């Protein structure tokens, strides 16, 4: 299914469709080619971090909150922070030099990363072959001494763990040099 078919399918379904299983499989194959080992747990479909936490609170490492944002200039950002991190968009906008930073509409998310709201993940960046999405990472994720970073594997009915070093290598392989910011 190409990007336009996915956008059309989600539109026709009234937004009820979730990222197809084949995208998760595609991600897993990509990670395997990079020799990146992950852990994965299945859970009911969740749409917020609050809904997800009862299913993942037992995992060692850090759980992410992921936001797909755009600015006034139509630049797009995938912001990944620790799950309980408060995020002030005005301050983030200033730090990134991104005027009027706000949540991007789901259609743009589907066009760029082929996932729906509730499924946003840094792992979707392997599909951004145009490299039009800027990855922004909370320094706590990569330099906080965590064994794993937990995020969705293209679907909001599972959570995947990846080491901080492997996430950085994944981003390097997808040619997404992350902007790493301290939010403390």
From Swiss-Prot:
GO MF assignments: aminoacyl-tRNA deacylase activity
Pfam families according to UniProt: tRNA_edit
InterPro entries recorded: ProX/PRXD1 (IPR040285), YbaK/aa-tRNA-synt-asso_dom_sf (IPR036754), YbaK/aa-tRNA-synth-assoc-dom (IPR007214)
Domain of life: Eukaryota
Family to which the UniProt record says this protein belongs: Belongs to the PRORSD1 family.
Name of the protein described by the UniProt record: Prolyl-tRNA synthetase associated domain-containing protein 1
Species in which this protein is naturally found: Danio rerio
Lineage start: Eukaryota, Metazoa, Chordata, Craniata, Vertebrata
Gene designation per UniProt: Prorsd1
């Amino acid at each position: 299914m190409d990007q336009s078919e996915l956008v059309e399918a989600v539109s026709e379904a009234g937004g009820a469709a979730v990222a197809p299983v084949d995208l998760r499989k595609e991600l897993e194959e990509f990670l395997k080619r990079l020799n990146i080992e992950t852990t994965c747990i299945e859970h009911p479909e969740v749409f917020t971090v609050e809904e997800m936490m009862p299913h993942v609170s037992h995992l060692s490492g850090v759980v992410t909150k992921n936001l797909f944002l755009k600015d006034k200039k139509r630049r797009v950002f995938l912001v990944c922070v620790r799950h309980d991190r408060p995020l002030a968009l005005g301050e983030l906008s200033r730090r990134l030099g991104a005027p009027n930073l706000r949540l991007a509409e789901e259609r743009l998310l589907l066009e760029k990363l082929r996932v729906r709201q509730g499924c946003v993940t840094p792992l979707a960046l392997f599909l951004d072959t145009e490299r039009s999405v800027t990855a922004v990472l909370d320094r706590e994720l990569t330099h906080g001494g965590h064994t794993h970073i937990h995020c969705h594997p293209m679907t909001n009915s599972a959570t995947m763990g990846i080491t901080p070093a492997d996430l950085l290598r994944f981003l390097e392989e997808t040619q997404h040099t992350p902007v790493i910011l301290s939010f403390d």
